């Protein structure tokens, strides 16, 4: 259960995915995120934001084909196996997620990202929604699962929490601090 909570790392590849339906998150994408925000934190939940979540519930758009029952025609972004392997070998992540139907891209035949994640016992989240509401850095993501026996997957409820804004945070703690000081002063004034 502890592996189902972690710092949110949102990898924004919307521009690249809009130009290439079969785009795959690369090691360069991950390193570019780190150049902007710092090292991916231990226990991170790394999620690709390709903008695909806006295509739901239109199956033709989600699967990138008119033949939504023929997997050989699927076109949607995912993680490149080198990026998944890099995360497994070099970062202590808890979860990988995508806003598409699979962590592997649509044209995958052997599903190497699934294999890499499974071998490392790292859950993969698919069809994650509302990613534009989460900052690329600074959220805490929790994955609530249902109990299944002998299942390889199932529905989840994924949610992100954000720290309070600095103004709100400071004002709350300033009020608490001033109240504490007032109580201490009143104790000294009333003491004989």
Identify what each model region corresponds to:
Residues 164-178:
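C-terminal GPI-anchoring signal of eukaryotic secretory precursors
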């Amino acid at each position: 259960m502890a592996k189902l909570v972690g710092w949110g790392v949102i990898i924004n590849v919307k521009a690249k995915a809009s130009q290439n339906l079969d785009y795959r998150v690369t090691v360069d994408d991950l390193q570019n995120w780190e150049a902007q925000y710092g090292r991916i934190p231990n226990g991170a939940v790394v999620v690709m934001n390709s903008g695909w979540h806006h295509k739901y519930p239109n199956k033709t758009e989600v699967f990138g084909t008119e033949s939504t029952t023929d997997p050989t025609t699927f076109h949607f972004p995912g993680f490149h196996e080198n990026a998944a392997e890099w995360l497994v070998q070099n970062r202590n992540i808890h979860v990988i997620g995508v806003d598409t139907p699979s962590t592997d891209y649509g044209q995958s035949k052997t599903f190497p990202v699934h294999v890499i994640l499974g071998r490392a016992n790292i859950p993969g989240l698919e069809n994650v929604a509302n990613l534009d509401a989460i900052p690329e850095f600074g959220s805490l993501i929790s994955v609530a699962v249902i109990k299944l026996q002998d299942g390889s997957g199932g529905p989840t409820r994924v949610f992100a929490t954000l720290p309070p804004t600095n103004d709100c945070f400071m004002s709350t703690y300033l009020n608490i601090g001033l109240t504490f000081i007032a109580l201490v002063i009143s104790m000294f004034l009333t003491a004989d």
